[in-house]
Amino acid sequence: ADCQAGDSADKLLAQKQHDVNYLVYKLYGDIRDDHLKELGETFNPQGDLLLYHDNGASVNTLMADFKDGRLLQKKHWFSLFNTRQREEALMMHRVLMNCKNWHAFVSNAAYFRTNMNEGEYLYALYVSLIHSGLGEGVVLPPLYEVTPHMFTNSEVIHEAYKAQMTNTPSKFESHFTGSKKNPEQHVAYFGEDVGMNTHHVLWHMEFPFWWEDSSGRHLDRKGESFFWVHHQLTVRYDAERLSNHLDPVEELSWNKAIDEGFAPHTAYKYGGYFPSRPDNVHFSDVDGVARVRDMSMTEDRIRDAIAHGYIDALDGSHIDIMNSHGIEFLGDIIESSGYSANPGFYGSLHNTAHIMLGRQGDPTGKFDLPPGVLEHFETSTRDPSFFRLHKYMDNIFREHKDSLTPYTRDELEFNGVSIDSIAIEGTLETFFENFEYSLLNAVDDTVDIADVEILTYIERLNHKKFSFLILVTNNNNTEVLATVRIFAWPLRDNNGIEYSFNEGRWRALELDRFWVKVKHGHHQITRQSTESSVTVPDVPSLQTLIDRADAAISSGCALHLEDYESALGLPNRFLLPKGQAQGMEFNLVVAVTDGRTDAALDDLHENTKFIHYGYDRQYPDKRPHGYPLDRRVDDERIFEALPNFKQRTVKLYSHEGVDGG
């Protein structure tokens, strides 16, 4: 074969990829791989307890509930916010995390795929592949092809069923929810993008709110990461709104009506349609979840903590948050996650708000409706109220960040290093293009009938490739390690009024963050848009992953899917917001900071992927997310006088309906 022959590790990885592909292919039917199907039917999880690090404690717990018939049946919806369903998924997750080798892992996965609820199983499988060393290098098949009904309008799913029944290969156009009468529909391409939905759900798998360190390890900067990823989603959504002549999103308020209703036009695979919410609904108490006044009280306690500058811990001590690590503790109590310093007192503002919003169509449970779109991370960004909820959270975080002392010139300067100029090679131009994905997993079928190809296509934003050209001078006599931080924010609001530096920097979109060694003298840094560490490329389709893994197994070649290993990051196609046909002005800012003092670990520049968490999952950059724009700026002259900081106005063009190069 014309390829690089794989070693034993490569061969095992190709086998793992093959196994994972078939563990999720046709999720709601029988396993289509003979070996895995046999494991699913004959493997006894309790047959050899030496297969597990915990000597079988986790598997005994799960099997006891399974044998007692206590587990959720198959063909039923699953929501992570449902306490019992989450616990069942986590029981399986603990079994997989305790497997000593791939044989044990895949045998249990095949067994529970055959015997457990599909949603619980899929969640446990993906979270375990992300967090277990056994899953390293495995590419997670795109969720929009594994569970297409969570990402695709039900009208299209019905068409897919018809095509399957008549055995007709078909391709259907998908449309975004709502009609042109609804102004929110103009930005549906962002909230309803299949890659954006996947980014959101995978981030919450990488940093689950239920995680405790007994699960195996500490998740570095989890609370701060919760703030930052949702802050970026919020400011990017606002940039898309401005691109479409809409005002930035208003924050949600517990005592005001939720202006925008939402009709999801999506249905559960089993369990009926996702509930709708009419316009102008006032918040109602939700039976068994929370009262509206509890939510206001929780918010007041969090704001009090910010005003006091400390969090009351469970043991009565005070945790000081008036420093760059305060955001970490604050994120944990706002979400709230298993790391919260005092869940009893500070409640669970974010998670409960998701359920409250999801249930406003049926707050008393009178109609016994299934969970709303906000009760699933896969579907929540489809509802415009998701961004209103996160604007509300974001403003609480901002209150904290604005209470911190602004950075001084001494703190921001990089001795001997200056930026001479910043430029862009190529044009900043976006366009829409059709994106296809398979609906094969959406339809039921039997092994005897051959599958026909059923695809859907939908418009997705993308941009022409471009590069940043940054000219720097190093006047030190030695080579230095520099961290390059690139941001941009919309220059004006929807009324054409220019944002002040302090307003703009809070609205800044992070475009890239990377290390580079700079020798003495002048140096040009060229960075391509495709290299951005804040984004990831679209993952290959499930069929492509199947073909690639099977080809690697039969040829003995290495698989080479490294580019898709980490799913953490925005879809690369969304690196730039849409912009406007006549050009929309953005303020582009570049800061070059001292990589040696920024690095949380030594020799880290060898691993340039910031977002991918570096060695052993420790976050490589010890500066706060958003640095140096994360604190308020009372006097922008400090930044204007910094040699290692540069800004310029750039124009971002949207090329409606024309394919770009």
From Swiss-Prot:
Entry binding sites for Cu cation B: H350, H354, H390
Signal sequence annotation: none
Glycosylation sites: N476
Domain of life: Eukaryota
Residues that hold Cu cation A according to the record: H200, H204, H230
Keyword vocabulary terms for this entry: Copper, Disulfide bond, Glycoprotein, Metal-binding, Oxygen transport, Secreted, Transport
Protein location: Secreted, Extracellular space
Disulfide bond positions: C3-C557
Tissue spec. comment: Hemolymph.
Record keyword Transferase present: no
Example GO molecular function: oxidoreductase activity
Pfam families: Hemocyanin_C, Hemocyanin_M, Hemocyanin_N
Major subcellular location class: secreted
Subunit structure: Hexamer of a number of different chains.
Protein's name according to its UniProt entry: Hemocyanin subunit
Taxonomic source organism: Scylla olivacea
